[in-house]
UniProtKB/Swiss-Prot annotation:
Belongs to the RodZ family. One of its GO terms (cellular component) is plasma membrane. The lineage of its organism: Bacteria, Pseudomonadati, Pseudomonadota, Gammaproteobacteria, Enterobacterales. The helix-turn-helix (HTH) motif in the cytoplasmic domain of the N-terminus is involved in the formation of spirals to maintain the rigid rod shape. As this protein is anchored in the cytoplasmic membrane, the HTH motif may contribute to protein-protein interactions to form the RodZ helix, which is localized beneath the cytoplasmic membrane. The C-terminal domain may be critical for determination of the rod shape by probably interacting with enzymes required for synthesis of the peptidoglycan layer, including PBPs in the periplasm. This is Cytoskeleton protein RodZ. PROSITE patterns: HTH_CROC1. One of its GO terms (biological process) is regulation of cell shape.
Length: 335
């Protein structure tokens, strides 16, 4: 009867209480049990108070309770029903794979990096395109402005061409005028001999004159033909005497055009030797004081010779830009 009462009383006690009572009967402290089982004192205390640490797996907790039961001489079979309540088996929480999470974060970071790279690339391409378009537009505007200026200057030159031709004609007339007095003098000298009226016949002049007196009168009378002989024999000035072959200027600038091209040439004194549009298959010969400053709208459409040597314009043709260069006395074109 006492045995059954004791058995019922043991069943009423929890697993932790039975282990604590057994420990106290053996005179062991919690520190001694913890040292023998190689556990923490807090773990032994939690077992006796029927607490299940959240950070401790149920499998380990059941193992600690069994070791504690063997230490205090309690059969494990008597504690099994209480173990199911105190330390039920729980599914272990499997932590997510660290490598997978790291790979996912790395992939996300790589995606952002790739997006940023493409964005920078698009910005660079856009800026390059905008810069090229602005440069091209500026060149076109400059060519248009130069063409307008050349047209205006060409119109001014055409309006001034008539007075220049008149002055040239006047100079030529003045050059030929000195020959007129000579011819007029000769004509006037000869005119009295031809148009002089015949004198009236005087009865006294019909008388016979002695031969000696006739000779004296003949010698004293000047011969009209003798006065005209020097004028007729004198050579008249001709235009061929005034024509001279001009010497070749060592600073001459020769240009041949294979297409329509706008051009402006200025010499060292600042004088514009030419400014305007040249047509295809045209040529231009200019002379002035070196160095020359040239501004060419289409470098590929012109071939330049200076001092008998061709001028290299390949660097302007490759870049398709308006050529600005200076030709000095040593024929070293510089931009």
């Amino acid at each position: 009867m006492n045995t059954e009462a004791t058995h019922d009383q043991n069943e009423a006690l929890t697993t932790g209480a039975r282990l604590r009572n057994a420990r106290e009967q053996l005179g062991l402290s919690q520190q001694a049990v913890a040292e023998r089982l190689c556990l923490k004192v807090s773990t032994v205390r939690d077992i006796e108070e029927d607490k299940a640490p959240a950070d401790l797996a149920s499998t380990f907790l059941r193992g600690y309770i069994r070791s504690y039961a063997r230490l205090v001489h309690i059969p494990e079979e008597e504690l099994l029903p209480g173990l199911e309540k105190q330390a039920p088996l729980r599914a272990a929480k499997v932590a997510p794979m660290q490598s997978f999470s790291l790979g996912k974060r790395r992939k996300k970071r790589d995606g952002w990096l790739m997006t940023f790279t493409w964005l920078v690339l698009f910005v660079v391409i856009g800026l390059s395109g905008a810069w090229w378009w602005q440069d091209h537009k500026a060149q076109q505007e400059e060519i248009t402005t130069m063409a307008d200026q050349s047209s205006a200057e060409l119109n001014n030159n055409q309006s001034q061409s008539v007075p220049l031709d008149t002055s040239t004609t006047t100079d030529q007339a003045m050059a030929t005028t000195p020959t007129s007095p000579v011819d007029t003098t000769a004509t006037n000298t000869q005119t009295p001999a031809v148009t002089a009226p015949a004198p009236a016949v005087d009865p006294q002049q019909n008388a016979v004159v002695p031969p000696s007196q006739a000779n004296v009168d003949t010698a004293a009378t000047p011969a009209p033909a003798a006065t005209t002989t020097p004028d007729s024999a004198a050579p008249l000035p001709t235009d061929q005497a005034g024509v001279t072959t001009p010497a070749v200027d060592p600073n001459a600038l020769v240009m041949n055009f294979t297409a329509d091209c706008w051009l402006e040439v200025t010499d060292a004194t600042g004088k514009k030797l030419f400014s305007g549009m040249q047509r295809k298959d045209g040529n231009l010969n200019l002379t002035g004081q070196a160095p020359y400053k040239l501004k060419i709208g289409a470098p590929a459409a012109v071939q330049i010779q200076y001092q008998g040597k061709p001028v290299d314009l390949s660097r302007f043709i490759r870049t398709n830009q308006v050529a600005r260069l200076t030709l000095n006395a040593e024929q070293s074109p510089a931009q």
